[in-house]
Amino acid sequence: VSTSSAPARPARPARPALPFEQPRPVEQSQRVRSSPAAQPLDVDVLVVGAGQAGLSAAYHLRRRGFVPLGPDGLPSAGLDDGASPGDRRTFVVLDAAPAPGGAWQFRWPSLTMAQTHAVHDLPGLALDPGDPRESASTAVGRYFGAYEQVNDLRVLRPVSVREVRDDPATGALLVEATTPDGPATWRARTLVNATGTWTKPFWPWYPGRETFAGRQLHTHDFGRAEDFAGRRVVVVGGGASATQFLLQIAPHAASTTWVTRREPVWVGGPFDENRGRDAVALVDERTRAGLAPESVVSVTGLPLTPVYEAGIASGVLRRLPMFSRVVPDGVAWDPGVRPDGVTHQGADVILWATGFRAALDHLGPLGLRGPGGGIVMDGPTVVADPRVQLVGYGPSASTIGANRAGREAVRAVLRVLDGAASRDGAAPYDGARPVVPGPA
C-alpha cells in the first residue's frame, strides 16, 4: 500500500448488466457441510482465494458459461438455462477468510482509502469512490462482498485448503480442506490458486534477532499507533507501509528510527492508472527476463505527497542504513556504517515492515518447485503442471495485474479442459521464467 495524493475517480457510467450479473438473494458466506467419510465433490475448476485475483478469475469463468457450485456440490438455486447438469462446466471458489475482502479486511483500521494505491475496479463492476476517509478494510470488504453477490459467485468460507495432491487414478487434483464442520475434499480437473501473500509475512534474519528483549512485530500484526506510546521504535523496511507506520507512530512514541537496505526513491505526481499499468509492465519485464519480482516500491517509488514532505522536513522520515545486528536492548551498526558515527540505538520495539512471500505451502505435494526452489511459470500457468494456474503473484500482485491474470488464467483453464495441456503434455509456452521465487 502507499499514500497517494490522487483525487478520487468518478464512478464509471452504468452499463447494461450481463445476464449472470443480476442480483440474487444468495448468502455471501456459505458453509460446507462435510465429514471425514464424505466423498470428494467433483468440479471442473477450483479457485482458491477470494481476493481481487480470485474474484477476477471467477468472473471470467462465469462469462465463459461456467456454473458456480454451492456447498452441497450442486449448481446455483434458480439456475434454469435448459442444460442438464452433466452439460455444464462448473467451478467452486474457496476462501479461508471469514468475510469478503481478501487481505484488505485484515489491514489496520487507520489505513484509509485516500492512503492506498488506487484500488482498481474488478471486471464488470465499478468501485464507488465513496468517502476517502473511510477505512480501506471496510470499503474494500463491502465492495468485494457486493461483487460476489452481484455475480452469484457462491464463495465458500471459511475454508482453509490444507493440501493439493495428484489423483493418478483420474488425472484430477484432490484438494483437501478444513471447514467449520470438519474436513472436506474436492476433486478438481484444474486449479486456480489465488491465495496471495498475507498469511506468509517475511521476517528477515539478522544476527542477534533472537536475543532482543523487547517486542518484535510485523506489518501483518500492526494494530493501532497508540499501542507504541512511550516506546522507542525501530521500523525496518523501505516500502509504503513502513513510511505510513512512522508517520502514525511518531506522535505517540518516545522515538522512531527508520532503517532500510537502500535509499528510498521519492517520486512526484499522483499514482494514477497509467502509472499503475507502467508498474505492472516493469514487473512483468523483470519476470520475463527470468528474475524474481522485486518489491512494489522498487518499481513505483514512494510518492512525494505533502504529507511525506512534512515527514521528511520533521525528521520522522530520515532514513538510516540497515543495522548490522540486533542486540538485547536495541540494534547496532558496525563502525563506519552510519554517516554520523553512531553504532547503537536503544529500542523497545522492532517493527518489521519487510513484506510477504507467496502462500503456496498447500501445493507442496505437487512438486512444482524447481532445483532452486522457485516455480517456473508461463504467464499464470505452472510449467511443471499446467493444471495449476497461479494468480496474484509477480506482475499480477496489483489490482490491475490481478484482473488481467484472472482472464489469462481462465483461457489457460479452457486449454486444459479442452485437452491441449496436461501434466504430462504441456502446451507450448513462450520461454519459461521463474515468477514465484522459492522460500527465503
Language model segments and positions:
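Glycine-rich flavin
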Residues: 116-132, 286-288
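Redox-cofactor-proximal catalytic regions of oxidoreductases
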Residues: 99-124
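Flavin (primarily FAD) cofactor-binding/catalytic cores of flavoenzymes
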Residues: 2-19, 25, 31-97, 102-103, ...
